[in-house]
């Protein structure tokens, strides 16, 4: 039976009320990972449609986002789920080819695509959920990729500005929170340096099967153009009078780094370089108008430069800093690299390490090889941003825990709805944010879990699950709430302070447990073990555990 061995920290015992007034709690998504319906509504083809269909072997399960989790047809029921678990914000992205099928505004706007996003936004607002809209989450129209190489060309800057302008015009009367770019580091490095993600470009010395690309060069060009496109979009945004109290920024995805050998000055300095190359690469220009000095020194003339006018547009172009945080690693300084085979990784002169010099991991390993549950890393990043960039407003635009397919993690191996590891991960990171706000003075203003639903996870396909809701891909994409969803529902209740009596707490706990039990009784996992004779024990333990967990208790782990 599960062993309950931890209570909430006292300072978080009031749940949502422990955070500043107006603090946003939400979930995050992206168009290609959620929507499906790739051939509906006059949608054009994106680079990810092309990549997943042309190179299925680069997706772990050879899948694609053609259907994804069918948010296109099910958004109303999914928004009800957000409301049910007391979320007050939702981060979604616009699919560029859904509103501009041919990439350029002068080639035609899809009014069907515009209507879809208008309907989603209106449904969110009707449920008192604040939309945070991302303009670019990697699904550039394939037409622009074919025509001039997408973000490899400066031509993309004008086309992105026109696309962003369309979004502001059509949705800005109801949307005040915007994000221009999601994880430009991933898009540049994975798309143009390692070739793992669309469009899959890199040098032959990185991947012998590569069709085209130039590692150590193209990623810097792509990121440069992304930053210039961002600046142009922000200039348009700030001239839109109908956008009231608007805020716009970029969602970065830094890791936190600790030195492989704390006694080695090179490893300590390597951590600083690694932060410059991952976070500073795209954050520094928007705050200071130029790339970090470490990058300019290391990359040399392969790193593009900004004109004075471009720098002026970039400085102050973010109203908040978006942070997508998942994990932390150790960094070991590299003494020598081959200058004839440059990559982004060798340019920073470090290796990422899963263990330190003593063979110890930075924290408990999560659901993938490079994932570690280390909330302290998030707190350190928040303090780093405050110290380095003058304490700007911060949104945690993504944070989540992925588990590989149907991996078993405890006694509850028969049912993934008992996601104790995810629950622990989320609670730990919310606590780290709380500490950063109240003890460190960091201006964190929102937290978005990745993600509401299991979904298409890029190169991992459907083999990694991050959702608060389990998607049954074998049974019509049915949704089942996991323990983490019900825990968040309880944590985010608006009536925390008015519901403190013992009888009401016990009533809530019992209801909480029954909800989870009901959500999984008819799932494929329960059906699959009926013949094993283990069903009564599994469901019995499930009920006992879930009925016991309320606002004051949560799972630390499950032990026999």
Swiss-Prot record:
Claim: Hydrolase is one of the keywords in the record: yes
pH-linked activity: Optimum pH is 6.0.
Catalytic residues (UniProt): 183, 398
Positions that bind a beta-D-glucoside: 33, 137, 182-183, 326, 398, 450, 457-458, 466
Top-level EC class: hydrolase
Catalytic activity: Hydrolysis of terminal, non-reducing beta-D-glucosyl residues with release of beta-D-glucose
One GO term (biological process): response to bacterium
GO cellular component: chloroplast envelope; membrane; peroxisome
GO molecular function: beta-glucosidase activity; thioglucosidase activity
EC number in record: 3.2.1.21
InterPro entries: Glyco_hydro_1 (IPR001360), Glyco_hydro_1_N_CS (IPR033132), Glycoside_hydrolase_SF (IPR017853)
Consequence the record notes for mutating residue 183 to D: Susceptibility to the nonhost powdery mildew species B.graminis and E.pisi. Loss of myrosinase activity but intact glucosidase activity
Pfam families: Glyco_hydro_1 (PF00232)
Cell location: Peroxisome
Biological role stated in the UniProt entry: Possesses beta-glucosidase activity toward 4-methyl-umbelliferyl-beta-D-glucoside in vitro. Possesses myrosinase activity toward indol-3-yl-methylglucosinolate (I3M) and 4-methoxy-indol-3-yl-methylglucosinolate (4MO-I3M) in vivo. Component of an inducible preinvasion resistance mechanism that prevents penetration of the nonhost fungal species B.graminis and E.pisi. Involved in indole glucosinolate (IGS) activation during pattern-triggered immunity (PTI). Functions as a myrosinase for the breakdown of flg22-triggered IGS.
Family to which the UniProt record says this protein belongs: Belongs to the glycosyl hydrolase 1 family.
Name the UniProt record assigns to this protein: Beta-glucosidase 26, peroxisomal
Species assigned in the record: Arabidopsis thaliana
Name of the gene encoding the protein in the UniProt record: BGLU26
